[in-house]
Amino acid sequence: MGRYASVIKFYALTVLKWQTVSIAAVLAFNVLLSVLVPAFTSISDPHVTIGSTDVVALVWVLAIGAILTPYGFRFLLYHGVSRSTQFTAMCLTLAALSAAWAVIVMAFISANLVFARTSVLYQLLYNRADVLGTITWEFAAFLLLAFVGWFTYLVLRVTGRNAKIALIAAPFMLGPILGLLNMATDGALLRAVGRAVVAAMGLSSSVPNPYVGVLSMLVLALAFGAAIRPILLRVQVRES
């Protein structure tokens, strides 16, 4: 475990300054909402909410999965840290980072009860604000996005120029293609996809269950992790 601890510490020191900047950005966003929300909503209505305070954190965690991967990869290899050890250490680092951000988001939720009537995606989706559910769901969402960022970076690094262009263009091409397929099936395609997503996130029953969504996101994160490992073990050092 000592070999993992040293690599995690290496990553943690790297993330610390980025983490500080990100927390400052989220804090500034919340302070701004604290001023704007009372100005544009009826103070007499305690149930009115505007915006989601965890969007900045979600985007940042998605980016950090890609940022941490190239940082120090060649340096750690040079100092005898194997790719397998780096993979495990990175997984543990992202898990710890996701847990920390879940707690930070919960702290902002508590502060917003006093300063601004805002909410987070968990509250908007499940219409509840329990501490355990919020932290667990946010942790799973952060972890999934971190692995998505990590996977995306590695795929772009190991593919050629034409493949990179195709991957970048794919999201813009996918929309029209899905639209045509949906028209061909009289809307059945998107309805089926929508039902699958709703069920996977635990929203299909009369009482939404966030822990179904947590399980789905964790399983998906594990799937990305399983896809990441063989890529990381084979990626060329000169590309890092």
Regions found by a protein language model. Give the residues of each.
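Aromatic- and glycine-rich beta-strand/loop motifs that create alpha-glucan
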Residues: M1-V21
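Long, hydrophobic alpha-helical segments
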Residues: T49-Y71
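Helix-loop-helix units of permease transmembrane domains in multi-pass membrane transporters
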Residues: T69-A95
